[in-house]
Each structure stands twice: as C-alpha cells, then as structure tokens.
Amino acid sequence: MLQMLPLIFDEPDADLCLPARLKPNRNLARTGGNKILVIDDDQILCLGIDTRLKANDYNPCFAHDAESALSTALAEMPDLIILDIGLPGHDGYFVMQSFNAYPELVDVPVIVLTGLDGFTHQRRCSDAGARRFFEKPVTNLRLMTAIRQLVG
C-alpha cells in the first residue's frame, strides 16, 4: 500500500510568489540563508521539509518534541518556525506560549503545519500568534510561498 507523503514534490517551484516582506536577518551573513526551525515528530515529514528548504537556500534545524523546542529555538535563533500541534509531551500551543515568554522569540513568525483540522484549531493557532496555518498534507508551493512571504 502506498503511503501519501505530507509534502508533494511533483509541482513547479514557487518562483512567481508575491514579493516577500523583507526584514533584518540575523542569520543571513553567518549562514548564507534564513534559518528555519522545524518542530515536528514525523521523521519522514522532516526529511521532506529538509530537502525542500535546502533546495530553496534556507538553513533548516530541527526539534522533535515540545521539550526540546524551546531550547533549540533559543540556541539557533531562527528567522521562522514551522510547528506541529500534535507533539509528544506538551502540544504546539504550549510551545507557542513558551516562545511568547522570551523577547528574542516573540517576533519570530510561526507557520503551523498540523494534521489537526478545523476552524477551532486554526483560530487557536492564530490567537497563540501563528502567522499561517496549514493542514497536512500541504503542497510545496503553498508552504514555500508562505515562507517567502514571511522571511524572504
């Protein structure tokens, strides 16, 4: 039986995206691209996102549970965070609340990428500070467009 991967790789790159809102980037000079922290316990999804981000000149780093999410974010100082809600231990809502307690993380845009659907989850994510909300699976075009709009 074939398993549907959360990211779809058979689409063209999103080269014709809307212009990105540019902001000062604390990682660009050091690493050559925006640093993006992916917080998800799905290893296959992380592998797919890693491949896609690197192909688009982003520098991914990863945390696989809520416990390591905050320490990784503080150590890596990402320009953007991609966050799953259904994490082992505490959920993604807890993670977003934790980020809001740190001035250095409060303005980092968060994209929620989750298997949870429905308006209630989308609203909760928005209220917690998420800038975008996508249900899994999401196409590369939609994800990369959102990333470009938020960090360039």
Predicted segments with their positions:
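Non-catalytic signal-transmission and effector/linker regions of two-component phosphorelay proteins
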Residues: 1-35, 141-152
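The feature encodes the CheY-like receiver
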Residues: 88, 106, 118
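Conserved Asp/Asn-Gly motif in the active-site loop of CheY-like receiver
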Residues: 63-67, 122, 140
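Two-component/phosphorelay signaling modules centered on CheY-like receiver
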Residues: 43-61
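Active-site beta3 strand of CheY-like receiver
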Residues: 76-82, 87
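Short hydrophobic/Thr-rich beta-strand motif most characteristic of the beta2 strand and flanking loop
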Residues: 57-64, 72, 134
